[in-house]
Amino acid sequence: MKFGWIMANDEDWEERKETVKDSLESSIPAVMVYEEDIEKVKELGNIKTISKNPNSDIVVIDKGDDLTILFDAKKEGKETGVFISIECKEDEEYASEVSRYDYVDYIILEGKDWNIIPLENLIADLFDENIKIVSLAKDINDARTAYEILERGVDGVLYVPKDINDVKDFATLIEKMNSEKLDLDCATITKVEAIGSGDRVCIDTCSMMEMGEGMLIGSYSRALFLVHAETVENPYVATRPFRVNAGPVHAYVLCTGNKTRYLSELKAGDGILIVDKDGMTREGIVGRVKIEKRPLMLIEAEYVGGEIVRTIVQNAETIRLVNENGAPISVVDLKVGDKVKLKIDTNARHFGMAIQETIIEK
């Protein structure tokens, strides 16, 4: 996941305070501040501070400073980083060197005459290292470029905003950078059958979902059906656009980081993946999980190659899958031959993580 920080370095505290408040409102996780501002920033809200001060949440020193500062900070459980201004090849080599120290979590890079080439070199050089690369950016285009360099891009951007709108635009960019596109396939319905009652899970999120959005859920990790959010108007019950009536407690749901979780494991505050009919994703937050006994329905489908996959949902008109045209279709209206959208995964799962292993799911 890409992340972004804000630099609050205006001359006047009142201006810096507004930058911090804008960052809080835009869900920016951390701000780089002057050492004397740390306590004042903490009074404004729950946001991480970045500075040289050992009392910061993320302790960052400049190139040439004593690295034992970071070693000591790491022992105290702090995150650590080195700010490096890239002015010559030696600076790039220094960045590569300190990135291999196990007590350094971040390198924060500011390009001078050259910016893109040093970033490309370091992204390639440090591909397998346990380090996060952060690039300083002073406008949205520079931030976007940094996120996209060599397709992989930097892990994060330290952004210097011009005004409140700049902070919000940056937050929007981060959300877009984290919006992965998944490949969705279609499967043909072969059976729809009422199977009795069981414990069903509703996922109420902190997001308002739109038509075409839902979550990827299924009984098998290799085939997750797109279950539509409760956004469709009907004459009997009010819509719940924040909700996906997901399925029984045993079912998998796809979460951020390409990990699956059992529906029964979810709780308030957990991250969840919202997926639309075209496979575009965005991150959501679970606000509440409801588990209730409800009548259930087995849905069986066949996809290319003759593979049969199944899922179970509540037997009710308001539960919908998504058909081949991207439209929601109620599970009570499903019939043999209908096509619905799902995500096929050839990997097995171990504690929710994709692995190369043979597994049989029935």
UniProtKB/Swiss-Prot annotation:
Keywords: Amino-acid biosynthesis, Aromatic amino acid biosynthesis, NAD, Oxidoreductase. The lineage of its organism: Archaea, Methanobacteriati, Methanobacteriota, Methanomada group, Methanococci. It catalyses: 2-amino-2,3,7-trideoxy-D-lyxo-hept-6-ulosonate + NAD(+) + H2O = 3-dehydroquinate + NH4(+) + NADH + H(+). HAMAP family: Arch_DHQ_synthase. This is 3-dehydroquinate synthase. Transmembrane segments: none annotated. It comes from Methanococcus aeolicus (strain ATCC BAA-1280 / DSM 17508 / OCM 812 / Nankai-3). Belongs to the archaeal-type DHQ synthase family. InterPro entries: DHQ_synth. PANTHER family: 3-DEHYDROQUINATE SYNTHASE (PTHR33563:SF1), PTHR33563. The keyword rRNA-binding does not apply. Pfam families: DHQS (PF01959). Its EC number is 1.4.1.24. GO terms for biological process: amino acid biosynthetic process; aromatic amino acid family biosynthetic process. The keyword Ribonucleoprotein does not apply. GO terms for molecular function: 3-dehydroquinate synthase activity; dehydroquinate synthase activity; NAD binding. Catalyzes the oxidative deamination and cyclization of 2-amino-3,7-dideoxy-D-threo-hept-6-ulosonic acid (ADH) to yield 3-dehydroquinate (DHQ), which is fed into the canonical shikimic pathway of aromatic amino acid biosynthesis.
